[in-house]
């Protein structure tokens, strides 16, 4: 049986969510093609002749981009079984099914995809016009080394720019999935509900090895929180450094875990970690409490200090625009970033992110959130909301426009930050009242990944114009 697996967006990385199920499907004798539409054009003949088409939907941006592609595939091959899988698939199952999706799989998806594919091959699947109940599998799996040979080569993906201007080819892998925390705004929670799954260490190392052989000089670990299983994590990076002493990497870790497991930060640094991405989200303690983030403003400051003590970069991410933020609060966020000397560590899109409230979000437990929303909007994949102060929504739109335009012209982060600051002061009516000393445009000594956008941001017009 001919199978096609499709990814639309994975933060500029070679998609683990394509490469992993390919191995499982090939082992069962299926003929599998993959298409990463973020990097390559779709081959019409491949989808027309496929009997099973799978769409990998890991987060918001990828799913928004995938919607018109799913519709087009269904129109061009109405007899193909279409499967949507990944974190965002079960949360949007009803909408996806109306687009033509037959099966929906969330959580640990590889084994379920194989099971469905076998049923389709044996003609045991429901009629193509029927749909299955969405499945969320949290069964532990024995992972297999991902098959990456048919994906675009690593050099075509996002690269790492070093302080001296040199570039490194970047690979991507995952050591865990899910998360043991229950942050209210996080889209992982409705699917994994506080559980995380470990990818066996030998699989992770073997996956890294094949990417090093393919030219990877740096590895991004895509785990939602690398320190969910801190013992597992430190064993993997120790083995990584033992095998490839010159290989660098980056990880994502909660502020709470950076503080709690501070003794392991030096291990990260000593084994080649260049920087840690951390979801700070806000510098307002009341907002952090509403989000149930597990850290405070002071903890954020402490994490910055701890990372600097071992010369480990910290790249904060934010949900900058949220129902409880004020104009003054947003200005405080910018001022805090400036005072902590983090301007070059914050990707500009982070200053434009507007809170997304997906189906099943714990934010809907809060009465003041419910009163702000107007019901679930399937096409936008979230509950739309308006700020009680229209000026905040206007500022968010202006900041997003600044960032999107700046991404086209390759402006330095310091210049983008300056423009956002000026727009904020204009929105507050304080154009001439606050004088700020901005860092020079050549002050950055931080490595950073070249991908401009983010998994929780609305896709740009260019991203939505995928040609199939």
Predicted regions span which residues?
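Radical SAM [4Fe-4S] cluster-binding motif and immediate context
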Residues: 152-313
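Conserved strand-to-helix beginnings and helix N-cap segments that scaffold or border functional pockets
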Residues: 15-18, 63-67, 198, 230-234, ...
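Short acidic/polar active-site loop segments enriched in Thr and Asp
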Residues: 51, 102, 217, 274, ...
């Amino acid at each position: 049986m001919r199978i096609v697996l499709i990814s639309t967006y994975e933060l500029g990385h070679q998609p683990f969510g394509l490469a992993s199920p390919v191995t499982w499907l090939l082992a069962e004798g299926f003929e599998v093609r993959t298409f990463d539409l973020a990097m390559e054009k779709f081959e019409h003949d491949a989808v027309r002749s496929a009997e099973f088409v799978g769409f990998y939907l890991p987060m918001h941006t990828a799913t928004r981009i995938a919607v018109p592609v799913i519709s087009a595939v269904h129109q061009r091959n109405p007899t193909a079984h279409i499967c949507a899988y990944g974190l965002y698939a079960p949360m949007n199952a009803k909408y996806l099914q109306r687009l033509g999706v037959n099966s929906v799989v969330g959580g640990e998806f590889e084994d379920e995809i194989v099971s469905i594919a076998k049923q389709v091959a044996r003609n045991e699947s429901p009629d193509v016009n029927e749909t299955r109940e969405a499945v969320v599998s949290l069964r532990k799996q024995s992972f297999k080394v991902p098959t990456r040979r048919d994906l675009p080569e690593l050099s075509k993906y996002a690269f790492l720019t070093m302080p001296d201007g040199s570039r490194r080819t970047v690979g991507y892998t995952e050591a865990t999935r899910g998360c043991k925390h229950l942050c209210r705004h996080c889209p992982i929670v409705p699917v994994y509900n506080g559980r995380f799954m470990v990818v066996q260490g030998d699989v992770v190392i073997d996956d890294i090895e094949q990417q090093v052989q393919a030219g990877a000089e740096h590895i991004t670990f895509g785990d939602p929180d690398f320190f969910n299983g801190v013992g597992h994590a430190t064993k993997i990076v120790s083995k990584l450094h033992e095998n490839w002493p010159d290989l660098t990497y980056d990880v994502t870790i909660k502020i709470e875990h950076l503080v709690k497991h501070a003794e392991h930060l030096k291990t990260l640094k000593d084994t080649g970690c260049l920087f840690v991405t951390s979801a700070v989200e806000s510098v307002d303690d009341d907002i952090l409490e509403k989000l149930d983030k597990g850290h405070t403003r002071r903890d954020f400051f402490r994490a910055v200090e701890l990372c600097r003590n071992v010369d480990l970069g910290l790249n904060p991410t934010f949900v900058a625009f949220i129902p409880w933020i004020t104009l003054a609060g947003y200005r405080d966020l910018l001022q805090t970033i400036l005072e902590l000397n983090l301007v070059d560590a914050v990707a500009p899109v982070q200053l434009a992110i507007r809170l997304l409230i997906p189906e099943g979000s714990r934010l809907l437990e809060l009465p003041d959130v419910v009163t702000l929303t107007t019901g679930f909007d399937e096409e936008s994949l979230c509950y739309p909301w308006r700020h009680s102060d229209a000026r905040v929504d206007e500022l968010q739109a202006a900041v997003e426009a600044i960032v999107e335009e700046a991404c086209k012209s390759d402006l330095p982060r310091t210049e983008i930050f300056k423009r956002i600051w000026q727009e904020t002061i204009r929105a507050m009516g304080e154009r001439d009242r606050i004088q700020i000393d901005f860092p020079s445009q050549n002050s950055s000594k931080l490595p950073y990944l070249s991908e401009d956008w983010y998994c929780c941001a609305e896709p740009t017009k260019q991203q939505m114009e995928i040609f199939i």
